[in-house]
Each structure stands twice: as C-alpha cells, then as structure tokens.
Regions:
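Acidic, Ala/Val/Gly-enriched low-complexity intrinsically disordered segments
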Residues: 4-6, 11, 23, 28-29, ...
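Cysteine-centered motifs
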Residues: 12, 16-19
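Class I S-adenosyl-L-methionine
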Residues: 16, 30-154, 162-181, 205, ...
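Signature of N6-adenine DNA methyltransferases within the class I
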Residues: 103-104, 108-117, 136-143, 158, ...
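Short helix-terminating capping/connector loops at secondary-structure junctions
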Residues: 126-127, 152-158, 186-192, 216-219, ...
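Conserved acidic residues
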Residues: 129, 222, 462
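S-adenosyl-L-methionine
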Residues: 178-210
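Polybasic, glycine- and aromatic-enriched phosphate-binding surface used to engage nucleic acids
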Residues: 375-584
Length: 585
C-alpha cells in the first residue's frame, strides 16, 4: 500500500507485498513494480476527494485507487495530488474574492467532493471528448472531469475543453489549472487542448449559435459540466436582450446558463449541473422547464438533504440538487434518484422512479417531482389516485391580504370595540387558530373601517396555512381551522404570511373544512408537497397545484378525525382509512 505524503512523495505504509518498497520515501516518477492501492489525504487535514470510479466505503476523506499496474496508479496519484492542490487553491481564491462582486456575479465555487460526485455521472461513449464549463471558476469541475476520463476505466485519447470565466482573478487561477491538466495529460499520452475565454458566456454562446457554419469549436459539445452563477436577471439588462434574441425566457442566471448550454450540446451529449432546486416547480420557471425539457431528457437526480453542506465555505443555505440530462427526445423508463446528507456522506440512498412520476407526460407546466425517498414514492403513488382539484371542490386559496407594515396606522396591540382579529402564523396552534394570543412584537387586531374594508373578510369557517417554514421543521404544510364559534367577531384579517382556503370569498362548510384541514396536516400531504417543491415557502400557487381527495373522501376523513386536527397518529390513520375505504367502494 502506498501513501502520497504532503510533499508529494510516495512510500509503502504496509507490508502488502504488492508494491515496490524502497528503504525510504521515493518520488512517484522513480517507482517501478506494482501497487494495489494509493491512499491520499490533503495536506491541510481537510477531507480529501473520493474516487468516482472506486468509492471509499468508509467515507473517511481518503481516496482509494484500484490497482491497474504501477504506471496507471502513479498517474492516478498525480491527478489526486493536483485535485487536492486545486481544492486548496479554490479555498484561497474564494476567500480573496470581493464580497460585493461575488454577490453581483453570483459566484459560489464548487468544493472538491461535489465536483468529484458530479463527474461520476458522466458516461461518454467516445474517446475524443469535448467539454464545456461555463462560469468555470478556478477549474475544479473540468479538472475533476479530465481526471475521471484519463484515470478511469475508459481512458480518453483526446480531450478539448472550452471554459468561460468573466472574473479576471478567477480566470488567472483557471489558466494555471488548465496548464497543470495539460502537463499531466501529456504524461498520460492524452492529447489535451483548452481555451479559456474571459468573456460573458451568454453573449458569446448566442453569437456562436448564430454563426453561418455549424459545428464550430464552441458548439456541439459532448459534455457540459456546470455550477452556474445564481442571480436574478434585470428586465432591462443586456443579458435579457441576449436571451430574448436567442429565444430563451429565464429569470435567473442559472436557468439561463442551463438553457444556453443545452443548445450547445450535440445530440446524445450529456449535461451535469448543480443548481438550486427552485427551477423544478412554480410559475417563474415554467417557460424554462418547457424549453429545457423540449431538448433534454432527465435520467439522474441527487438531492442534498442539508442546505448548508454543499457550499459550506460560502454559507449557502439554498437547497441544491445535482442532475444529469442527455440531449435526446427518447425518454428513459426510469430516473435514478439519490439523496445524501452532504457531499461526504458515505451512504447515499438510491432508487429508480418511473420517468412519468418525475415529469408527468400530460403536465403542461413540466413540474419536476423530486421523489427523495421511499415515503416520497408511496406518496406519489397515492397522489396519482387523488381525483380532485380545488376547482372541482368549489374552493380557492388566497394569500392573506394584510401587509402589516403598510397597514400600520390601523393595527392595534390590544383589541377594542372598533377592531377585529388580525391572524398571524403564531396564532396557529394544534390544528386551530387561537386568538387572542399576545406577542411581544405583533399586533393582535386591525381597525375595522372603510379604509381597511378590502383587507378583511367575513368571520366564517376557513382553513389557514403558514406560508413559511424552516426546512428542518417536521412538516412543510402547517394548517389550522379558523372557527368563528371560537372567535366571536363580524370580520377577520389574515396577515400576508398566511394562505387561506375559501369558497368564492366566503367560508367553507364546517365538516368539509375539518376534513381538508386534517388532510393538509397529514404526513401523506406533506410528503406529496415535498415531492413537488423544495421551497420552505408554501405559496398559494403551490397549493392550487395539489390534487385533493374528493368531497366524499374529505367528509370521511372529518368523521374519523373528529375534533383532533393536530395529533399526527390520529390524522394519518384517518386519512389512510378514508382513502382506502373510498377506493374499495
């Protein structure tokens, strides 16, 4: 067994008998013989990379490289050393970036374990491979991908890389990384060509696509690997003009990069990207989803369960996913979905889900259902049996009308004869709206007069749902029954951090409201919602997209749950029994 030390030397650290064991450490270039395994740790003590072709089962920050003869093993060791040096370089450069510029450009550089995981998704068929890396940073993704193609079981003979990086400081580091890759490719007998373009990717790519001759060196790529910038696009910007001219509708740079990159892939080409999950659902990304999936077919998804682990250095709390897609119209039977706590989780969970369960073929919005575990799969199966939309039930859902800072002159800390209840998220307790409920920073009532008439609704039976929750909360959907028998008043105001269900602006029949409240508080509904959305925000639009039990099923749920709308065991049993009974009739 050979160890690569911090000084780049190799030495046998066990009596394995499979490697040449000199009297002391030797340079990798001087070794002869055969080696079985090389173990590597980074010099600063941080977790090292894990090989994408031989995963380290212990997950202890050590690379395990299989024996393929000493020449291949030493070659792999050199790549490992380069990638670990590159990880240190990434941290140094990232720490020196100007925070203002970093925010403006949406820069979050890819950590080494994430890069290594992403490269493992590629399966190119040829040995002459062209790579596009847009927003390349210091080159972590491309370097890891080259190491995979050179050191993996299917060694490439020629690699061409096109890399875009607009930040001058990062571009300098990127040039250095590519020069290092070129040197190592030469020692491996692999022809390597690269081009670092210090220009705006979207503008340059749009220009390349309009060239009279197709098939230039800046189009028709075999592989695209992306950690695109994350920033909203100004409606009056040059970027917006470029995208419109290219036929791309995108509200964020990351979705714009994905849409443009898809156009640059050759048929059968592969794309792997790490992005926020937000594109998977919602009206803001509907046009993007239609555009992207008209060209690309999804076949792999990976979800990080923790918001903070993927980009720990940058304190990014966005929920991220990694996906692999192929430019083809042929849909696979299934999508492979996996999840892990973070990049260094040694035991990711993996399963296959029908493609039609991930992107429903008749869904005009092309929502991506991220079925993250077995519970998600079961919820998806049950949801397929739900028959009703809110419209079918004669119901609607709206966002609370009272924006408290705008209505401040009319708010009251203590209710009086001329005010009515103002309901906030903190008023939701054990399945019911509780009022009054003092709060140190919030009002409890709003003045009822002509100026506030449009902010209030009649005090009748409603279902109220929190719009915001922490990802780590037990339930994403938190619903409560507003019962006018418990809160005596002529009208009520719902604050803007709440959604409420109603029937054409008026209340619901009480039994129907109890059944629907219980359904929304069920584990089934919560898991179903998480399949649809990675947001901690529960928008009215999201609730409108859900499918619901029939009116008869909701009344069965109400009968079984009684008045207990918050006990999880009772609620889940009532929902399960009502849905099973209705299906058996």
């Amino acid at each position: 067994m050979l160890k690569v030390a911090a000084n780049g030397k190799l030495a046998c650290i066990s009596g394995c008998g499979n490697c040449y064991r000199p009297a002391g450490p030797m340079n990798a270039d001087k070794l002869t013989g055969r080696a079985s395994v090389v173990l590597v740790k980074t010099s600063d003590g941080s977790p090292g990379l894990r090989s994408s072709w031989l995963q380290n089962p212990k997950g202890n920050g050590v690379i395990a490289i299989g024996s393929r003869g000493l020449e291949d093993t030493i070659s792999s060791a050199r790549w490992v050393r380069l990638l670990n040096e590159l990880e240190s370089r990434r941290r140094q450069v990232s720490g020196r970036l100007d925070p203002v510029s970093k925010a403006e450009l949406g820069q979050f550089l890819t950590p080494a374990p994430v890069a290594q995981f992403m490269t493992g998704m590629f399966a190119p068929q040829g040995r002459d491979i062209s790579i596009l890396d847009a927003g390349a940073g210091v080159g972590s993704l491309t370097a890891a991908l080259i190491a995979r193609f050179v050191g993996g079981p299917r060694t490439a003979t020629r690699i061409r890389a096109t890399l875009y990086e607009i930040d001058s400081a990062l571009a300098q580091a990127l040039e250095r990384t590519m020069a290092d890759c070129a040197e190592l490719c030469a020692t491996c007998g692999v022809m390597f060509e690269y081009e670092v373009l210090r220009e705006d990717f979207l503008g340059a790519a749009a220009a390349a696509l309009t060239l009279p001759l197709a098939g230039t060196s800046r189009t028709d790529f075999d592989c695209v690997i992306l950690n695109p910038p994350y920033r909203k696009i100004n409606g009056e910007s040059e970027t917006r003009r470029i995208l419109t001219a290219a036929g791309i509708e995108a509200n964020n740079l990351y979705s714009a990069f994905l849409a443009m990159a898809a156009r640059l892939l050759k048929q059968g080409g592969e794309l792997v990207a790490i992005t926020p999950r937000s594109f998977c659902n919602g009206p803001y990304f509907k046009a993007f989803r239609r555009d992207f999936f008209s060209r690309m077919t999804l076949d792999r998804l990976h979800v990080y369960e923790s918001r903070s682990h993927a980009f720990r250095d940058d304190e990014v709390l966005q929920e991220n996913l990694i996906f692999h897609a192929v430019r083809t119209q042929k849909r696979p039977d299934a999508v492979v979905i996996s999840s892990s706590l973070g990049p260094l989780d040694p035991s990711p969970r993996m399963w296959r889900v029908s493609y039609a369960d991930v992107i429903h073929p008749r869904d005009p919005e092309m929502v991506v259902h991220v079925i993250a575990d077995e519970a998600g799969r079961k919820a998806a199966d049950v949801a397929d049996q739900l028959s009703c939309s809110l419209h079918d039930l004669g119901l609607s859902v709206s966002t609370g009308r009272v924006v408290d800072f705008r209505a401040r002159p009319y708010l009251r800390v203590n209710p009086d004869a001329r005010s009515v209840p103002l309901i906030y998220p903190f008023n939701l307790e054990n399945g019911y709206v509780v009022w009054p409920k003092p709060h140190p920073k919030k009002s409890t009532a709003i003045k009822s007069e002509s100026a506030t008439a449009d902010l209030l609704i009649p005090s009748e039976v409603y279902i109220v749902v929190k719009r915001f929750s922490a990802k780590e909360e037990r339930r994403r959907i938190v619903a409560a029954l507003y019962d006018p028998d418990l809160i005596r008043c002529p009208a009520v105001g719902f604050e803007n951090h709440l959604n409420y269900y109603h029937a054409e602006g008026r209340g619901l029949p009480r039994p129907l409201a109890r059944g629907l409240t219980a359904f929304l508080n069920s584990t089934l509904a919560d898991t179903y919602f998480r399949n649809l959305s990675g947001h901690t925000q529960v928008n009215a639009q999201d609730l409108r997209r859900l499918k619901y039990p029939s009116r008869e099923q909701l009344l069965l749920i109400a009968d079984r749950v009684g008045d207990d709308l918050a006990d999880q065991i009772i609620v889940d049993r009532a929902v399960e029994e009502a849905l099973e009974l209705a299906c058996s009739i």
